[in-house]
């Protein structure tokens, strides 16, 4: 269970702003734990806390705030965080295209490389996509939380990102879901290495599955579906200062 070390906390509100589950709230004496919200141990709070004041009852402090390994690739993987607050600043188009070209080396079943990308580029185009999705959600009751939260100022579909990278593939290819996920995961690390923020867009996949109008808007041909999507841009006020804990891999070794 998550709790706050009061002596270390400076009540800056960073944990409250970045927690995707709304676990933190401001009380009479400072930041408190909301009694009815569930912590998913994503550890955004611990990663961003400037005073390392976040604690977890089942973990010692040195486990919550581990040291980075020092090896660049390992550090890149361990320091990657989901960004949900983006500035309006566009990434460099040539840099994104370069990352796409490098990610083309990702493995795929029988080297089919059957998936394709649609890049929704610029704040206005992303908002146009968002508004089309929201209109359909309101009309047909799909993901009803999305338009309700948007009306309160929270955009879970695009998080205000100025760019969205959408991956689609034919239904009849060898690995219609796995190959796009592998490709996008490698692309994400390349973008993070460039200093960009990213967040996987599960809601866009859900809405596009439901509405062919969205697939058409995204240039997805008949017989194909969106498999995954990535919000891309520069973080707005999100700085993750600390590496955080993850459980060790759950692995079964079959040995001689």
PLM regions: where:
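Acidic, surface-exposed loops and disordered segments
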Residues: 1-256
